[in-house]
Amino acid sequence: MSSGPASTLLQAQVGPRGSAIPRDPAKAAAAPPVRLGDTIFTADDPAAEWHKAGHHTVRVFLRKGPWALIWYLQAASPVDGKPFDVVVVERQRWNNLAAETPAASYRASVFGRDYALYGHGDFQRWVAASRSWPVSDRELNRWQSYGMLLPWGIGPKLQAPSEWSYMDPVPDYVPLDKGGLTPGMGTTGLRDEVGPIVHRQARYIMERSAEMRRVSMNYGLTAASIPWHVRGADGAPLLLDTPNIPLKLQQYYQNYPEERIISVSPGMQFDWDIDNAHRPCPSLIPALLSELHPFFVEEQVFSACAVLNTVTPDYRGASGKLVDQGQGRDWAWSMRDLLLAYALLRSMPPQDWLPEVACFDAILVANLERAVKALGVPGMGQLGMFWEEDAYDSEPNPTFWPSIRTGQRPGVYTGMIVNYIAYTLDWGRRLHGDPRWSELQTAFAERFQARRFLASGPFCFLNLPARLEGRWFSDWRQMAQAVGLPADIARQPWHAFDKPVNDPRVYEYTTEYPATFYHGLKLAQEAGANSADVDTAIALMEAQIRRGDTDSYPAFAMRHSR
């Protein structure tokens, strides 16, 4: 082993655990001594090989025993040309990283600046902070020992967990009618959970430094991703259903918490990702409330970019195989993210660091064409591309056994996938304008939606995930005050949205599900659908909406969300 405090530290980590970390004497002898406070690497060396080659990325291996540090250094963002102030450092290792518990800190000079370098074995990630880190190594160790996740890139307001007012336990279930939205509300723990963004999630998103946001955006657009100029064999932009196996994007994104669309929160026992979060959209509402503030538009665009990076199921192969429930959900949420990014970019002047709205439009059109073609595939069941291959649901759901009793295939959309798809199709019809949205929405309502609604029996209303955006709105009102957005944002009135079903305007501040569910059925009825199921479902919903008096959709949703 090389001499110096770093080697002593490594030995101390390994010693009490025996031979947990295999040692390579040759590599250890070749490794230079690294001490606390040493300058590991200077990136602005004009004679450096990476600089002469004109590469954006350089990997520098700092050998210490059987592991290495890999520095991903980019002098400037290919997106906006501005130099990065945050450098992401990845640590790779060939054995179990859990054996190394203490955190180590060094100083590094990058791009002519000095940074504190912090890392932790359990996270396989090192971050060179562009500002002083307000916690000690001992505090970092305490975070890990208590099983708390490190909030990489959280920005200048980072505090120790003991100082975080919203660092309270996340229960498995908190009823939504017990006191309304609170910072510690957490999630219901059910598969039909669709929001809201809890206070700590909003804090994490909003407190990310500007440098970290630009780094994340750069990941979404260029680094190990699908750049906008990449085309498929047919000359069209890559579709959502194009497998990207060579890039191994799923594995790539799993290891980088700060690159998830909505990253993990300290204290939360699960990760919000595209497979289990049902994709709440935290950026659309504040973007509208702040009159398209670039911060929130960028967040929504990054979410859409990450969709292109991470959603890789083969929706329509040569064999015409069925698509399972999870892929149907991913299709709905992915198209929604692309749709919202398209709508926001269309409504604001072009920005140098954001892709053009035409990129999202082309991808939406290509995937709509694929979905419409799926309608004509024989033997594909209801709508073809939306079907569940597994005869079970990962969580108990009251629609499961009713679907058995009504003779449907066991487990068909036992979750809320039917509502997610209905929601996405309704918003696509209003925001994008492509006539294929209406074609898909009408076909989906006629072939599947009404029967799925009626099959849930007495649960048909209780099981609608009627989470009003109003619950998000109260949170964003608090967030607007916390981050210093214009005060009138917090005082804007709530917009009623019981508009005609054929109203082309957008529902400005809501993503409420019962309305979108109802609209699809109503459109199918007006299009001449000769279906008793559609007529019955509409009659039931209208009776519920008008129960006692003529209620608006918000009142209807609020009543059934409890």
Locate the predicted segments by residue:
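Catalytic cores of extracellular degradative/oxidative enzymes
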Residues: 22-28, 35-41, 45-562
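Solvent-exposed N-terminal domain segments of exported/luminal and surface proteins
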Residues: 2-35
